[in-house]
Amino acid sequence: GAGTPGRKGVILSGFSGSTSIPPVHDNSDYKGYSSTIPIARFIDAILEPGKVINWNGKSVKLPPLKMCIFAGTNPFHRHQQINRIIEGWRKLETVIAIDNQWTSTCRFADIVLPATTQFERNDLDQYGNHSNRGIIAMKQVVPPQFEARNDFDIFRELCRRFNREEAFTEGLDEMGWLKRIWQEGVQQGKG
């Protein structure tokens, strides 16, 4: 899915400034709040905006969050304080879940966008660890079922609505990105 192969996809590139196209904002600290927060502390940002925490060797001021998009992840499954999640969830104005399973996150979301499974899209995956790593091509087996769309198309459409489609796609379609990431992997493997 979107963001899986490398760090460029962790945040929408059209908003994060991880491309050569100028971002909506410079991705530095915004109004004194940190531009990044540890995922395990996102509930703290919702419930205690402005709180300063120590993270990764530095002080981080948690930003106020009004909206969250969860793509292919289920915080209800991985977070240790479910009641605190529910409390924070109620404070958000909008929650969007993008997933191919009907998870707890989907059940609590305001909007659910159905994503394709690994059988319904072309993708790349990583295998191995440390000195024995590689990437493999995963070819689409069946067309997307019902209203499911692949992550790339979902995020491209979201970026289009914010006039950031070109920044997100960098002029490439889904297969163009897969080929580019594959070639980057081939070059790294030669290193």
Q: Where on the chain are the PLM-derived regions?
A:
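Short acidic (Asp/Glu) and glycine-rich catalytic loops that position anionic groups and cofactors
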Residues: 21-22, 64-65, 131-140
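N-terminal leader/propeptide and maturation segments of large enzyme subunits in energy/redox metabolism
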Residues: 69, 141-191
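Generic structural signal for well-ordered, non-membrane alpha-helical segments
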Residues: 61, 131, 135, 147-155
